[in-house]
């Protein structure tokens, strides 16, 4: 079948018209790309040339979707920190600028998830559902945007809530030698936030995989994982991931804080973070200082911990409470990193190996521990019993040391030592068993009223459990007043102590004072 000349002409004209229209409307989306080249690779870092426009801490893309951070920016060469498995990279590979800083996904979808510092899921539950992405490096709130620490954060640990109180927005350092229970205190605090409208972020920095797995299993078994985000870097991860981990975790926590929520973040631990930064700095040939740490080691921790605060009401009133953990060596709390963190934070909880060896858990040395701002947030009921308790415990520790030399002691001193031993026994607490506020106050009030003094030491644990069980008989109106800011009245004391006396009656005995030799 042959087409008529007129029809063929019309078809050509229509086709040419469409092509001309498409040509006029076409606007090529040209995107300039700046490509550099790897010149050398070392453990966790790479030297890159050919990227004259790169900025400090800008993300660089390496082959196989490996990312790095521009850490040293020189005129001719870039020192990049690698954030993934870099063993397949080699000199001569291409490197591309990404044009933005490191960011991390944030949002409600991260609750209950386990991720690494660049937002990749590690729990096998599929991709993350994020509300937004925030840079990991963010400025801390201005002074005028901060509110004083005025609301308590219950840890569920008797000795902390009574003698070393922590408030919302506070930064309380936990430090001690290896295997003294530092992580256990932080995890118990997370467990105690259940049904208290406090979200949690647990950041494991360069930890053993078995240790992190144990923490995650505890959170899961106790139902705490549902309100917790876990950010993990293991000991075999590149040092770059360990370096950015606490900053990424803080951005995740800040998202909730800016929505008016209360958030608790645990850094476990900043000793590994400091060592990772030292390793990167030495590999990048930055000048070393004390203990081979770079000169800005104080600044990297201060800018991190200054992001923890209590926002003013006009910004939503949210809070970010930080519990950084530091590992000491041979009980030396005057070392470089511990003293840096002590000066940055609002107090410290020191765990003593000596107490740990005696079976006093948590092994908190009350004399070396302090909370500089938490006392202002402590409930009045705690303040009514804490001051006398701390003084009595301090006297006991001093006299116990004196008695160890074999001196003959009078009856008054023996009584003080006996009372102190019962204070120590009552302050013991098993791991993963946070105690409610009313139960804590009942036990502490019984201590200050000397009700435990006639209870044998070998049944102190059973007697304490009986006191805690007896709190169910305390009138509801007294319990409500204890939870508020009202002071503890004499009527309230009597209402609490009456069921406590009844609970302790089966354990009472007339104990004969023994001479301590």
Curated annotation (Swiss-Prot):
Q: Membrane topology for this entry?
A: Peripheral membrane protein
- Gene Ontology cellular component annotations, sorted alphabetically: plasma membrane; proton-transporting ATP synthase complex
Positions of the record's site feature: Required for activity: 369
Q: Name one GO molecular function term.
A: ATP binding
Q: Which reaction does it catalyse?
A: ATP + H2O + 4 H(+)(in) = ADP + phosphate + 5 H(+)(out)
EC number of the protein: 7.1.2.2
- Keyword Hydrolase assigned: no
Identify the Pfam families for this entry: ATP-synt_ab, ATP-synt_ab_C, ATP-synt_ab_N
Q: Where is ATP bound in this sequence?
A: 176-183
- Name the UniProt key words of this record, in alphabetical order: ATP synthesis, ATP-binding, Cell inner membrane, Cell membrane, CF(1), Hydrogen ion transport, Ion transport, Membrane, Nucleotide-binding, Translocase, Transport
Principal location listed in the UniProt entry: membrane
For the protein in the UniProt heading, the enzyme class is: translocase
Q: Does the keyword Cell inner membrane apply?
A: yes
CDD domains given in the database record: ATP-synt_F1_alpha_C, ATP-synt_F1_alpha_N, F1-ATPase_alpha_CD
Provide the family line: Belongs to the ATPase alpha/beta chains family.
Q: Which NCBIfam families match?
A: alt_F1F0_F1_al, atpA, PRK13343.1
Name of the protein in question: ATP synthase subunit alpha 1
Species this protein is from: Shewanella frigidimarina (strain NCIMB 400)
